[in-house]
């Protein structure tokens, strides 16, 4: 360890010292002693300079400032200068001088040695994009340094002047950071390593920051990162000596503990296949590098970026349904508090890091990439606070779950679809497929004692919110699959090639449409078949796949819509009169609560369709959702039904009743409803668009009442167009039913609300274990009675609804039964007052406020006391009767006047009236004036 003794300034006077010199020395000796080469020019650490002495002796400081990290480096200028001085010094290695006094050493160097030192200094300085300025004036600021930079035409990223933390004064040095190394080198060469700031020469040096040593330690038991001074693990309590595991420099915990890409998957998880690769687009090496998720921030949470502001949680869950089994508790959409729209990103949290890594790898390997509501989604690991990222081998083994099985199975379908290239989709003969994944899945499900993920299939001939098919092949040789995610999600046709015994459930396709010209005209629906239906199909292999289901609906060509740009919520203007946001580009009004648009010209509510990139009326969507089924039902009817035309207020009133019931049934439907495969199609079809259409009608009625204008909506259907059947809200179609059906369909309609075969109440959407429990539910359940009352009211006519509402209002009104009794029987006479037992003598009424107004009588207590002492009325008081005769009267004075002041009293007493007081006052003032 280096140690150098530092003396005072008076000691550094010369080579031979100042105390032993005689005063008779010649002038030549004096001039030689004061030669500049005799001075000690060693660079001692100053207050504003490097604190390297501190760092030489103590390297364990945990809190180092930024300026110390810049200066306290092994290759700093001062240390280099000392090493060169010791190298050229004849005294030998660094340490104490031989004679014990540094003043006995000759520190003078020749001119050649100084030039050699400068050359070595320039060679040893390593170029850096950070330049250090030393010997700055105390008055110099950052602006002065920036002025020097601007004068040379150089742009710096940051200029930082080091100041004292307590006083705020400059410490005499600063750092200038450049964006590129070339800029720093060019500036140093242009100024020849020196500057002139405020008339003072400033030296310039390359800064070499000291690398920070990772002093934290990892516990090899639980994987938690602990601070340096902690002697025991924060989580498991294992001592540091037993559980210490040093982190290599530049690495992180998650890079060591997390196996990705299927290289070190734990037992119980399905192996990940190779990611999908489109031929001619990417090489296998480039795709494997790009698709592998980065493990730098690996955790159990994934972030979805670039979301549509109108995307909901249902659309996100639907887009991710082919790859993972998620619920609303796994997804969190970040919304704006003011507009209630999402802020463009959402988080997906899974149970383990392994599952999150598998899902991330699947989503990043999709080609085309994942899209939700027409926008391409960027998928990454979420960057959060420090958490427990590592897990032991046993916890990773227990991380196998149904979600990871579904992820691996979905990615297996993608890899199987990509093995044969694009030509494999149209091959008439299907190549043999390896079903080891499904067999492994079956074994896992049996070991857990539950059915597999695909054991229950309930979606028949329907489009899920996040799964839509592509065009069908007219020859039946094989559908042309689309590997788009989100709205056009990954095709699951590979599941239809699986063996019967491979999995309890099976995906099946029903190709529809006669012409395969475009993917927009025809649609292909995917059906999940329950085991019972699958068994019936296997018994008759020659039967077509669609024979086990109701006849497929014929697809219809979509109507032509105008294309619009994606709505930009930031350009909307708030309208105080309507409470909506006005879109200046389209002229529509936006409702942030329902996320729908209102057209003031056509008086219609619209919603944004990301697939068609246009605004679609809400009523049109609700009617189109049931158009195909209604067409097939009308072919069996010969008579035409009458349809009622309702105003917006009436429809909004009807929808308001149903909105209340829907909100109550949502939680019951999610928690207690067990799907039944034999339910009717119209009861099973739950369209989010139709639900939004009903909710928006309620908003329309509220807007109409606020503007006090009647807005007549177009007819729900024309005479030659059938009425839409019941969908999610089965009672709304009853509003358009004929009156004849309403009269005859009361008990029959209520009977249809119960499925006795499945022991289920279709109205409450609940299934019961026995018939007695179902009957008890119908008789005693308050929820069933409430839903039944809403169902009955929904089928009433307008007159009946008005009468029922009037009756309800009368019942809710307060009934004054006392007034009814008085009107019927009259008011009874008041009872006679009770008679007193002893009748007292009626005394004359005396004004209690002025008892002495008329003077004092001889019957008062004071007069009787005086009479008892010998006083007689009319005589004065006192022993000799020399006192006053008349009693003293209280007189009023003018407020604020003294006792003896003139005009303070006008002879008015307190018992006189206002008129008498005014008269006496006038008389007194008149007498005083004379």
Swiss-Prot record:
Give me the Gene Ontology terms describing cellular component.
nuclear speck; protein-containing complex
Question: Sites of the modification Omega-N-methylarginine?
Answer: 902
Q: Does this UniProt record's set of keywords contain Zinc?
A: yes
Q: Domain RRM: where? A: 129-209, 300-384
Xref: Pfam families: G-patch, OCRE, RRM_1, Zn_ribbon_RanBP
Annotated membrane-spanning segments are none
Segment Disordered: which positions? 1-127, 464-487, 503-522, 537-566, 620-646, 712-753, 818-861
* Basic and acidic residues: bias regions: 1-14, 21-45, 98-111, 623-639, 743-753
Q: Where is the composition biased (Acidic residues)?
A: 59-70, 112-125
Q: Where in the cell is it found?
A: Nucleus
Segments forming domain G-patch: 858-904
> Compositional bias of type Basic residues: which residue ranges?
80-89
Molecular function per GO: identical protein binding; miRNA binding; zinc ion binding
Regions of compositional bias (Low complexity) in chain numbering: 540-562
- Could you list this entry's UniProt keywords, alphabetically sorted: Acetylation, Metal-binding, Methylation, Nucleus, Phosphoprotein, Repeat, RNA-binding, Zinc, Zinc-finger
Q: Which GO terms describe its biological process?
A: 3'-UTR-mediated mRNA stabilization; negative regulation of cell population proliferation; negative regulation of mRNA splicing, via spliceosome; negative regulation of transcription by RNA polymerase II; negative regulation of vascular associated smooth muscle cell proliferation; positive regulation of vascular associated smooth muscle cell apoptotic process; regulation of vascular associated smooth muscle cell apoptotic process; vascular associated smooth muscle cell apoptotic process
Q: Where are the zinc fingers (C2H2-type)?
A: 759-784
Q: Extract the InterPro entries matched here.
A: G_patch_dom (IPR000467), Nucleotide-bd_a/b_plait_sf (IPR012677), OCRE (IPR041591), RBD_domain_sf (IPR035979), RBM10_OCRE (IPR035618), RBM10_RRM2 (IPR034992), RRM_dom (IPR000504), Znf_C2H2_type (IPR013087)
Which stretches are tagged as biased composition: Polar residues? 507-522
Q: Does the keyword Phosphoprotein apply?
A: yes
Further information in the entry reads: RBM10 transcripts also code for an alternative open reading frame (alt-ORF) coding for the MINAS-60 (AC P0DW27) protein. MINAS-60 and RBM10 ORFs are overlapping and are formed by shifting the reading frame.
Function of the protein: Binds to ssRNA containing the consensus sequence 5'-AGGUAA-3'. May be involved in post-transcriptional processing, most probably in mRNA splicing. Binds to RNA homopolymers, with a preference for poly(G) and poly(U) and little for poly(A). May bind to specific miRNA hairpins.
Whom does it interact with, and what assembly results? Associates with the spliceosome. Component of a large chromatin remodeling complex, at least composed of MYSM1, PCAF, RBM10 and KIF11/TRIP5.
The protein depicted here goes by the name RNA-binding protein 10
Which species is this UniProt entry from?
A: Mus musculus (Mouse)
Lineage, broadest ranks: Eukaryota, Metazoa, Chordata, Craniata, Vertebrata
